[in-house]
């Protein structure tokens, strides 16, 4: 009897945890409105290193990327001008090595700054993570860091 009661309690607890997890919001996608879809696609695919994934529209106006488990980045063509905004509003990608990423930027002729705005410098956060900031072809700010988690 005790064993059956314990089994029921464990099952009820697991069901409650599962139901609780399903009610939390999760990130599905980020969308960026871009002027030149091909330039933006090359930036995120070839420079940042994201994998493209199928998009349902097949209209030449969208590129989708996987950016994590069940999370995507959607590029949407049609912007009539560059994005203007402060780097406090940015998207961030973690890479195995900021130094190796900086080498890719140098080969591509793409400048970067640290948090203080110093050109070609790297910020080292208080937790030891190194980070840089750059802008994509449309002016969106992108942070690249070497955070492990």
Regions found by a protein language model. Give the residues of each.
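N-terminal beta-strand motif that seeds the catalytic metal site of vicinal oxygen chelate
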Residues: 19-38, 89-91
